[in-house]
A protein has these predicted regions:
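Surface-exposed interaction/ligand-binding surfaces
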Residues: 1-183
Length: 183
């Protein structure tokens, strides 16, 4: 029996993964260095996220279209993606995801696009926190030997999008009691 334990760092720095005990067996400890993901350039990556908004200066309660694009040159399994979050806002997913092929910086990618409608409910500076994708990247040509289910080997990868700042404008003074922002 072989046990595989996947760990994800919660912060940067020099970290020690302690020895893991299971019955009479014990692993070795491991010392690692975790770098800030913002220092990693997403270009030429096999897997990355891009996010954009229709406007960075909406009025209060105005619809902002938030578009997420997952670029990948690898096959993934067991993916988990966080949802967009913005304090004092209503957020709703729009439609179904779309998939297409594209070239980005000379490389071919499969892109999955997802859209959300965000309605800020409070004026002022607000930040849409970064989205996080955790996925098993399938290692080509490697299957678990003697596996009853013939599962493919994966390595866990986590990618994070950029944060987006919104400068939400208060409703104009001459609008009266009823307010419905529109384009």
């Amino acid at each position: 029996i072989q046990w595989i334990l996947t760990v994800m760092a919660k912060h940067t720095g020099k970290l020690v993964i302690p020895a893991i005990n299971f019955g009479n067996d014990s692993s070795q400890f491991a010392a690692i260095v975790v770098n800030d993901s913002s220092q990693v350039n997403n270009t030429n990556e096999d897997l990355f996220l891009q996010v954009e908004v229709s406007t960075t200066e909406p009025y209060i309660q105005q619809q902002v279209i938030y578009t997420l694009k997952l670029f990948r040159r690898v096959n993934i399994a067991q993916a988990s993606l966080t949802e967009p979050e913005l304090a004092d806002a209503l957020i709703e997913k729009l439609g179904e995801d779309t998939n297409y092929n594209t070239q980005f910086q000379g490389e071919n990618y499969v892109v999955t696009k997802r859209k959300y409608a965000i309605f800020p409910q409070k004026s002022g500076i607000a930040t849409i926190i970064p989205l996080s994708l955790t996925a098993g990247v399938i290692i080509p040509g490697q299957r678990r030997s003697n596996s009853f289910f013939n599962q493919q080997r994966t390595r866990t990868k986590q990618v994070v999008s950029a944060a987006i700042k919104l400068d939400v404008q208060a409703k104009p003074e001459n609008t009266g009691v009823d307010w419905l922002p529109a384009k």
